[in-house]
């Protein structure tokens, strides 16, 4: 199969879809025509020469990379890339379609095969291609929150873990999944007073077994969220409903109840965010804004700030699926691997992921009707 790897052009997105090691795996499987856009790996400290040595057939400009049968990317395409779409093209990347009507319509109009990393789902409910970036984003969220609590960044001027004679500060993590758990790990490591809120009693028990007395757990309901947010210095939003818009769990009134200089980090912003005051997506160039005295961090591609780590972690997880698609074609690969089939969000001009269709009020077609 002819495979293209374009350079990411989203603001400060320094990741690349495949490491040179991943390219070796593809070329050894017989997929020798890999079009790597010139400079695509530089942000992750991979040189063009490394890709050529790994077996990439040639380096190219973006248009040529996009002209291949399967496109491997990291982030969802931006508007300037929609013109590269064509019927039957396979796009394998993070899509996050629920809040992105224009991209969704472009995939429908061009009849692109849109396979989203974030909705590839194993039988046990886990999301293997979202997990590595959730780990990164979760760990970053607490680090970033601690930074913006510093006075010179607009925060209260406090240290999360306190020091001798000064009490630790309060961190609330809403969502106890992969991202939330990793945010809590870093907060505990910093010595903060940590609360994790989740909807699942079973998950809360798992977190208590994991953290012991280092973390307090609470059931997710409006009262518990309001009380915990009110008394928190840092709130991390880490709720995920696969493929769907994030629920608005923290109201504007809750944000107003926080002390000035408090910080919220919305990991879920790429799905619309969980804070009612998350009314914009920010960038690494301009990552925060202040509303009701609270610093809001709403960067949708957080792992792009640590691209070397993120690219390696992403490739480790995506390469088995990319190989299945390249070796068998997407239809047979999806028939053989139900987890991969759940990643198909757009196919033959239809939306085939129910949560996306519901979020945008579009007709839903079961993917099984199109892949047999």
UniProtKB/Swiss-Prot annotation:
Entry keyword set: Cytoplasm, NAD, Nucleotide-binding, Oxidoreductase, Sporulation
Thermoactivity: Loses about 50% of its initial activity when heated at 65 degrees Celsius for 5 minutes.
Record: residues binding substrate: 15, 75
Record note on pH: Optimum pH is 10.0-10.5 for the oxidative deamination of L-alanine and about 9.0 for reductive amination of pyruvate.
Residues annotated as signal peptide: none
Pathway recorded for this protein: Amino-acid degradation; L-alanine degradation via dehydrogenase pathway; NH(3) and pyruvate from L-alanine: step 1/1
GO annotation (BP), single: alanine catabolic process
Reaction it catalyzes: L-alanine + NAD(+) + H2O = pyruvate + NH4(+) + NADH + H(+)
InterPro entries listed in its UniProt record: Ala_DH, Ala_DH/PNT_CS2, AlaDH/PNT_CS1, AlaDH/PNT_N, AlaDH/PNT_NAD(H)-bd, NAD(P)-bd_dom_sf
Cellular localization per UniProt: Cytoplasm
Residues of the active site: 96 (proton donor/acceptor), 270 (proton donor/acceptor)
One Gene Ontology cellular component: plasma membrane
Primary localization: cytoplasm
Binding site for NAD(+): 134, 178-179, 198, 220, 239-240, 267-270, 280, 299-302
Molecular function terms from GO: alanine dehydrogenase activity; nucleotide binding
Record comment: activity regulation: Inhibited by p-chloromercuribenzoate and HgCl(2) and by Cu(2+) and Pb(2+) salts, unaffected by amino acids such as D-alanine and beta-alanine or by nucleotides or nucleosides.
EC nos: 1.4.1.1
One protein family per Pfam: AlaDh_PNT_C
Keyword rRNA processing: no
Cited function: Catalyzes the reversible reductive amination of pyruvate to L-alanine. Prefers L-alanine for oxidative deamination, other substrates are poorly reactive. In the other direction 2-oxobutyrate is almost as reactive as pyruvate. Ammonia is the sole amino donor for the reductive amination of pyruvate, NADPH is inert. Reductive amination proceeds through a sequential, ordered ternary-binary mechanism, where NADH binds first followed by ammonia and pyruvate; the products are released in the order L-alanine and NAD(+).
Family: Belongs to the AlaDH/PNT family.
Assembly mode: Homohexamer.
UniProt-recorded name of the protein: Alanine dehydrogenase
The organism of origin for this protein: Lysinibacillus sphaericus
């Amino acid at each position: 199969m002819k495979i293209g790897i374009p350079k990411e052009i989203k603001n400060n997105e320094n990741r690349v879809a495949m490491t040179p090691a991943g390219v070796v795996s593809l070329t050894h499987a017989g997929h020798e025509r890999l079009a790597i856009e010139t400079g695509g790996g530089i942000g992750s400290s991979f040189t063009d020469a490394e890709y050529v040595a790994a077996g990439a057939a040639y380096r190219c400009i973006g248009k040529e990379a996009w002209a291949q049968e399967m496109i491997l990317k990291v982030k969802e395409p931006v508007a300037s890339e929609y013109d590269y779409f064509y019927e039957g093209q396979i796009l394998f990347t993070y899509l996050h379609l629920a809040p992105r009507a224009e991209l969704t319509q472009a995939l429908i109009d061009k009849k692109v095969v849109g396979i989203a990393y974030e909705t590839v789902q194993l039988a046990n409910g886990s999301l293997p291609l979202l997990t590595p970036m959730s780990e990164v984003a979760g760990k970053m969220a607490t680090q970033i929150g601690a930074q913006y609590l510093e006075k010179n960044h607009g925060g209260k001027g406090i240290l999360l873990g306190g020091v001798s004679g000064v009490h630790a500060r309060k961190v609330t993590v809403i969502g106890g999944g992969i991202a939330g758990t990793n945010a809590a790990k870093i907060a505990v490591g910093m010595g903060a007073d940590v609360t994790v809120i989740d909807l699942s009693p079973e998950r809360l028990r798992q977190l208590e077994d994991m953290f012991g007395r280092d973390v307090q757990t609470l059931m997710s309901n409006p009262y518990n969220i309001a009380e915990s947010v009110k008394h928190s210095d840092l709130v991390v939003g880490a709720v995920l409903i696969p493929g769907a818009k994030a629920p608005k769990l923290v109201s504007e009134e809750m944000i107003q109840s926080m002390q000035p200089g408090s910080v919220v980090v919305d990991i879920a912003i790429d799905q619309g965010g969980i804070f009612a005051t998350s009314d914009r997506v920010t960038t690494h160039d301009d990552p925060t804004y202040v509303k009701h005295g609270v610093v809001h961090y709403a960067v949708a591609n957080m792992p792009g700030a640590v691209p070397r780590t993120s690219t390696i972690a992403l490739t480790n997880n995506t390469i088995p699926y990319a190989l299945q698609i390249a070796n068998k074609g997407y239809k047979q690969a999806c028939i053989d691997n139900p987890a991969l089939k759940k990643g198909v969000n757009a196919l033959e001009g239809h939306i085939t992921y129910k949560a996306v269709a519901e979020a945008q009020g579009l007709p839903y077609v079961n993917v099984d009707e199109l892949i047999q």
